[in-house]
């Protein structure tokens, strides 16, 4: 698995919103527009409703435009810590009572923090939507950050970091790669935070984060499922409408400086096998120019390299030459910060990382000089569709793709229109982006140098109580 899956997963979810409709764009897009409604409350909160009446269920999500990229040095991880604290009680609820109320009606809830946002969701039978809105609106304005609860929860977060990062070689490499690839962009910091920052964090840091960013005018409410737009609007006005807007902190531009040479790092960590990852700075989709073709060409290139079992990387390096046990590619197509295009590989036994690098470069040169045939382009687009088509079967996935686009400054209204740009990608576009972006001056190479793996006692991997978010 590619160590850049965090970025890739976010990009894939967003890209899926566009690619899903490829096979039936003409007839499906207008219907989706009719089934999706948007309005804004007087306090600035945007509400988006997607009707899907196939089952009497609803996904209710609140997304805040506040993620790890908004943190300052010395307080990394506070966005994720606050996410944990959102389940630790309000003026009206005891710690843990929020989730108990959701479970009591047969629903499920959770939350997640990204570099660009923090999101909270519930999936419930449709008659319980009013109760979910009441609960979520309560903690938007009445969160109680107790000093004692914080002291316990910060220990949970630190243990989460130990288990999911410090004890996982691929996670360590990913963390170090991001820190090396980005110089001044906050994407260089891990979402979970640096351990020293967590050790020195106080409940006042979490409280300040809550006060700075958690407001209706910094949030988007997405409701998908068996609902009527008018009913959702009335409920949103009832529960979220009375919450006062806040003055949101100014977000200063944090544009990554131009890289001026290859960066290479070697990470020593307990592991069975070595691995090498190449990560190039790459453009993202800009809300101000959704028709710029390069991000779409890079997405198609990623699929050509690693979109199916017979893709170029797998066919040439794993099947034919047997140089690698695994190899994959990914590209972060969207986000508020700079993005990366990556290729990762684990060499087969007896094969060197140098040979892997040499052959990956040969594959890229071949694409740059010879291009891609029309049949391969068509096949990749078809495979992209087949891989994504089932996402719309889930009301949860529908809510996700809408919300992620909105968090990145792209209206859901343009998701299907953007598909036309995928169709426009030609072989010369792919050749151009390889030549323009996959260059050494924009490259960071991370090598995993495996160290002896220490055996752990039984139960050592057990997650601490409360590790859920």
Regions from the PLM with identified roles:
Residues 162, 179, 248-310:
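His/Glu-based metal-binding/catalytic segments typifying zinc-dependent metallopeptidases
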Residues 78-86, 301:
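Active-site His/Glu-centered metal-binding helix of metallohydrolases
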Residues 37-42, 265-269:
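Short acidic-hydrophobic surface loop/beta-edge motif
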Residues 10-23:
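Bacterial N-terminal signal peptides
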Residues 154, 204-239, 442-443:
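Non-catalytic, conformational "gating/processing" segments within enzyme and secreted inhibitor domains
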Residues 50, 55-81, 95-140, 169-196, ...:
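M16 family metallopeptidases and their MPP-like homologs
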Residues 1-8:
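N-terminal secretory signal peptides that target proteins for export/translocation
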Residues 24-28:
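Boundary at the C-terminal end of the N-terminal hydrophobic targeting segment
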């Amino acid at each position: 698995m590619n160590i850049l899956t965090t970025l890739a997963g976010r990009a894939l979810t967003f890209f899926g919103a566009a690619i899903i409709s490829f096979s039936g764009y003409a007839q499906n897009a207008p219907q989706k527009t009719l089934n999706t409604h948007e309005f804004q409350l007087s306090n600035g909160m945007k509400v988006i409703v997607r009707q899907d009446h196939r089952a009497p269920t609803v996904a209710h999500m609140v997304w805040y435009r506040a993620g790890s990229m908004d943190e300052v040095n010395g307080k990394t991880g506070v966005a994720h810590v606050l996410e944990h604290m959102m389940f630790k009680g309000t003026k009206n609820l005891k710690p843990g009572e929020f989730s108990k109320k959701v479970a009591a009606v047969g629903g499920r809830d959770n939350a997640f923090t990204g570099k660009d946002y923090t999101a909270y969701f519930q999936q419930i039978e449709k008659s319980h939507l009013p109760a979910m809105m009441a609960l979520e609106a309560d903690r938007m304005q009445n969160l109680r950050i107790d000093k004692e609860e914080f002291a316990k929860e910060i220990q949970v977060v630190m243990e989460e970091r130990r288990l999911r990062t410090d004890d996982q070689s691929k996670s360590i490499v990913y963390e170090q790669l991001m820190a090396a690839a980005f110089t001044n962009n906050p994407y260089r910091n891990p979402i979970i935070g640096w351990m020293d920052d967590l050790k020195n964090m106080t409940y006042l840091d979490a409280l300040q984060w809550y006060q700075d960013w958690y407001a209706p005018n910094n949030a988007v409410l997405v409701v998908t499922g068996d609902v009527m737009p008018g009913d959702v609007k009335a409920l949103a006005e009832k529960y979220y409408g009375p919450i006062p807007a806040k003055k949101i902190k100014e977000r200063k531009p944090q544009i990554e400086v131009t890289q001026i040479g290859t960066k290479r790092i070697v990470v020593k960590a307990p592991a069975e096998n070595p691995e090498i990852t190449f990560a190039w700075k790459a453009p993202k989709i800009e809300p101000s120019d959704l028709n710029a073709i390069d991000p779409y060409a890079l997405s198609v290139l990623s699929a050509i390299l690693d979109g199916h079992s017979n893709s170029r990387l797998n066919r040439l390096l794993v099947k034919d030459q047997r140089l690698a046990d695994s190899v994959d590619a990914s590209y972060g197509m969207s986000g508020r910060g700079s993005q990366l295009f990556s290729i990762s590989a684990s060499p087969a036994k007896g094969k060197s990382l140098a040979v892997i690098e040499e052959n990956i470069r040969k594959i890229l040169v071949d694409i740059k000089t010879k291009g891609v045939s029309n049949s391969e382009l068509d096949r990749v687009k078809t495979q992209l569709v087949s891989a994504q088509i089932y996402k719309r079967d889930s009301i949860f996935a529908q809510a996700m793709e809408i919300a992620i686009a909105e968090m990145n400054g792209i209206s859901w209204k343009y998701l299907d229109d953007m598909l036309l740009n995928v169709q426009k990608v030609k072989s010369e576009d792919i050749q151009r982006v390889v030549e323009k972006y996959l260059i050494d001056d924009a490259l960071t190479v991370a090598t995993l140098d495996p160290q002896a793996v220490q055996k752990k006692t039984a139960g050592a991997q057990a997650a601490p109580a409360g590790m859920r978010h």
